[in-house]
């Protein structure tokens, strides 16, 4: 990489001192540990219906839902799939499963039937909680004992019941479960640094540690309090929102306003109505905020913090947002699902804030270690030298579900998780991301694994070979594009290929451009040489962007 690696490891730690982490507690006990301080304060607010539950009501309802899930046969170590938008029912189901020592695997409700079936089967889900409009996509699923819907449906199959039946269960039926800190509580799916989606095993200890790294201590890195109102517009099936919004909010005793989906005008109405103070966003939402003229018609002065994550945010976009929200502290965090997910957080969000640089994604979280290595040699690099970012700490995943080989490729023998991201740490301990080793495409913060799309493409009889890479896009970040080798005599068109894929995948995985090519460039090992394809793409498309 143009730098001389050092055999002596340079390890970076937070500027803030390490803290005590009550990692003996199950996640649900940890989140409600300070319940007595804010039991009567609002906890969950449905941004669509305005229904509000206090902290005491959420704890009680979670116990009832847990008892209801137990009555349906959910046991310790079992998996429930939450195929839901942001909703009170999502939160109650997640906590209810945790109380039973069960795991929640979260899935995007916009997934196609095939995508849902793959994840449910791989995770070994026993029960699915969803909306009635998605029940038709669940037909033929093996191993599912019951489907629970959160809305009133006119007609549902026999094995479908309403969520209200869970809520009406006597909480006394909830069994006492001995939950071990190393037990898995969350099972999100991620493509990791490469390849197909895999179940990421996040334990009670791991998530307790991750939340504590952010919001606990005398000078928390992420200063939330019971006086704060958090806007939960990012989907809870994504680990960023589940961890840094929901779990951190619960731990701090803040009110959490749940938005089922992103609509810019409704978002501003909720900010004004509930005096939202904390706004966790992703760059595409920031783009809407700065471009939409309606923003100026609403009072958004209550926002004191804008957190951005899931994808990098450019300096120009940052500056435009500062003009719209002059009262807000703006900063970025950095993470990946396998890391628990938060690796670093902007110290401008601390109770006693630090000055931070534009473009930085913060400093490494407390009670963790970070190093930068030369990807070729594995040797540690010092400050201001770009290399692969590695993280170590109790917050990282236990491993990939039923995939020890992929786990070994991601977490080394010394416990370092290799992110596949290229970055450097400057003289002030701030982390900057400069490139990606991993092949994932980031569409508005969502992961798109090229290998998943390639596997679909090459099953088509008119395609001999295929490769998928990304192209930059101003509003979406990155878009998937395909390079295709036609089968002999085939005249398959770009439009036919796009339609073939769009029928099988969720909207953000759709192919946006198709380029026909004589052969896919590959190394002797058979690995696709994506750099060559990106170079060709740069020649085809001015500025490397969508035409």
UniProtKB/Swiss-Prot annotation:
Binding positions (ATP): 190-194, 238, 310-312, 332-333, 337, 421, 436, 527
Region (SBD2): 333-400
Region (SBD1) residue spans: 263-332
Transmembrane domains' residue ranges: none
Molecular function terms from GO: 4-coumarate-CoA ligase activity; ATP binding; trans-cinnamate-CoA ligase activity
UniProt name for this protein: 4-coumarate-CoA ligase 1
InterPro entries xref list: AMP-bd_C, AMP-bd_C_sf, AMP-binding_CS, AMP-dep_synth/lig_dom, ANL_N_sf
Annotated keywords: ATP-binding, Ligase, Nucleotide-binding, Phenylpropanoid metabolism
Enzyme class per UniProt: ligase
Reactions catalysed according to its record: (E)-4-coumarate + ATP + CoA = (E)-4-coumaroyl-CoA + AMP + diphosphate
Domain notes per entry: Both substrate-binding domains (SBD1 and SBD2) are involved in the substrate recognition, and are sufficient to confer the substrate specificity.
UniProt EC number: 6.2.1.12
Cysteines joined through disulfide linkages: none
Tissue: Mostly expressed in stems, and, to a lower extent, in bulbs.
GN (gene name): 4CL1
Native organism taxonomy: Eukaryota, Viridiplantae, Streptophyta, Embryophyta, Tracheophyta
Any Pfam family hit: AMP-binding
Similarity section: Belongs to the ATP-dependent AMP-binding enzyme family.
Function: Produces CoA thioesters of a variety of hydroxy- and methoxy-substituted cinnamic acids, which are used to synthesize several phenylpropanoid-derived compounds, including anthocyanins, flavonoids, isoflavonoids, coumarins, lignin, suberin and wall-bound phenolics.
A GO BP annotation: phenylpropanoid metabolic process
UniProt KW tRNA processing keyword: no
């Amino acid at each position: 990489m143009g730098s001389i690696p050092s055999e002596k490891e340079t390890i970076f730690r937070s500027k803030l001192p390490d803290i005590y982490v009550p990692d003996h507690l199950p996640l649900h006990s940890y989140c409600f540990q300070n319940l007595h301080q804010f039991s009567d304060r609002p906890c969950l607010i449905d941004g669509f219906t305005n229904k509000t539950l206090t902290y005491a009501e959420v704890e009680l309802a979670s116990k009832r839902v847990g008892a209801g899930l137990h009555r349906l046969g959910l046991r310790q170590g079992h998996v429930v799939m939450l195929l839901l938008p942001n909703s009170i029912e999502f939160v109650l189901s997640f906590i209810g499963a945790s109380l039973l020592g069960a795991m929640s695997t979260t899935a995007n409700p916009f997934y196609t039937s095939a995508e849902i079936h793959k994840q449910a089967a791989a995770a070994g889900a026993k029960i699915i909680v969803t909306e009635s409009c998605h029940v038709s996509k669940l037909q033929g699923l093996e191993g599912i004992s019951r489907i629970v819907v959160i809305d009133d449906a006119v007609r549902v199959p026999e094995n479908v019941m309403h969520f209200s039946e869970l809520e009406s269960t006597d909480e006394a039926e909830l069994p006492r479960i001995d939950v071990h800190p190393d037990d898995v509580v969350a099972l999100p799916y991620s493509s990791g640094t490469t390849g197909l989606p895999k179940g990421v095993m996040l334990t009670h200890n791991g998530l307790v540690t991750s939340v504590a790294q952010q919001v606990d201590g005398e000078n928390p890195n992420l200063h939330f309090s019971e006086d704060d109102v958090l806007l939960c517009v990012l989907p809870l099936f994504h680990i960023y929102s589940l961890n840094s919004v929901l779990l951190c909010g619960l731990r701090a005793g803040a009110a959490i306003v749940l938005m089922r989906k992103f609509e810019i005008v409704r978002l501003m109405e909720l900010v004004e109505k509930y005096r939202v103070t904390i706004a966790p966003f992703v760059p595409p939402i920031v783009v809407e905020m700065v471009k939409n003229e309606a923003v100026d018609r609403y009072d958004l002065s209550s926002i004191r913090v804008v957190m951005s994550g899931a994808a990098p945010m450019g300096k120009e976009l940052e500056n435009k947002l500062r003009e719209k929200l002059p009262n807000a502290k703006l900063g970025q965090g950095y993470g990946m699902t396998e890391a628990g997910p938060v690796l670093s957080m902007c110290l401008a969000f601390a109770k006693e804030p630090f000055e931070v640089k534009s473009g930085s994604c913060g400093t490494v979280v407390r009670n963790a270690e970070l190093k930068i290595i030369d990807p070729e040699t594995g040797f540690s690099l010092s400050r201001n030298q770009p290399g692969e970012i590695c993280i170590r700490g109790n917050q990282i995943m236990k491993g990939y579900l039923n995939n020890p080989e992929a786990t070994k490729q991601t977490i080394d023998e010394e416990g370092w998780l290799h992110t596949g991201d290229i970055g450097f740490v400057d003289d002030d301990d701030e982390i900057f991301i400069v490139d990606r080793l991993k092949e994932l495409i980031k569409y508005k913060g969502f992961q798109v694994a090229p290998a998943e799309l390639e596997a679909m493409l090459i099953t088509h009889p008119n395609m001999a070979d295929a490769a998928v890479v990304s192209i930059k896009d101003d509003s979406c970040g990155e878009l998937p594009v395909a390079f295709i080798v036609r089968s002999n005599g085939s005249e398959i068109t770009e439009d036919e290929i796009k339609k073939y894929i769009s029928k099988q995948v969720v909207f953000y995985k759709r192919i946006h451009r198709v380029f026909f090519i004589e052969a896919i460039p590959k190394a002797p090992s058979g690995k696709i040489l994506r750099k060559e394809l990106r170079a060709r793409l740069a020649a085809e498309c001015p500025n490397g962007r969508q035409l």
